[in-house]
């Protein structure tokens, strides 16, 4: 839905640093030129994209030598009891699957944009929302991102 990119753009805007590159992870060929690396990844049908894991595994040694951070964007984080790195099931599972330990970790609630989804996606997400007591009106868009939390995360990054 583009919410991860929107969060990246907000981080860039809040940092007041004109030397920030926002790139899709599969377009990053080399991280040598960067002092800091922040990886943002969203959940789609219960999983992060495989490119996220491939990128981290390929660059783990370099990532460990740099200031680094990871943030997750998922709709489960709309719930107060699942909106921290310690309580979000996707972040917990992610950290169990990789050898990298990010120096800073954030988790942000994403967005559901029912009108933009194709038929199957719309009703699959509606069903998931129904069983988790989320919004099910398919004529609307629901943004759950706590922008104040994004701002606090950005301050912690010292970009």
Model-predicted regions and their roles:
Residues 1-17:
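N-terminal beta1-alpha1 ligand-phosphate binding loop
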Residues 12-23, 33-36, 44-159:
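FMN-binding flavodoxin-like domain, especially the glycine-rich phosphate-binding loop
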Residues 26-27:
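Short, polar loop motifs at secondary-structure junctions
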Residues 39:
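Redox-cofactor binding/interface segments in oxidoreductases and associated redox assembly factors
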């Amino acid at each position: 839905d583009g919410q991860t990119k929107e969060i990246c753009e907000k981080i860039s805007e809040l940092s007041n640093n004109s030397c920030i590159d926002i790139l899709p992870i599969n377009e990053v060929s080399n991280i040598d030129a960067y002092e800091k690396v922040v990886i943002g990844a969203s959940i789609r049908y219960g999983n992060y994209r495989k490119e996220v894991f491939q990128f981290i595994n390929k660059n783990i040694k370099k990532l460990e030598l740099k200031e680094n951070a990871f943030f997750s964007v998922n709709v489960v984080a709309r719930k107060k009891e699942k909106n921290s790195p310690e309580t979000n099931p996707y972040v917990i599972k992610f950290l169990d699957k990789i050898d990298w330990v990010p120096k800073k970790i954030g988790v942000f609630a994403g967005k559901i944009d029912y009108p933009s989804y194709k038929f199957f996606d719309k009703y699959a997400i509606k069903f998931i929302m129904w069983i988790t007591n989320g919004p099910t009106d398919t004529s609307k868009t629901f943004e759950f991102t706590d922008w104040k939390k994004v701002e606090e995360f950005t301050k912690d990054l010292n970009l």
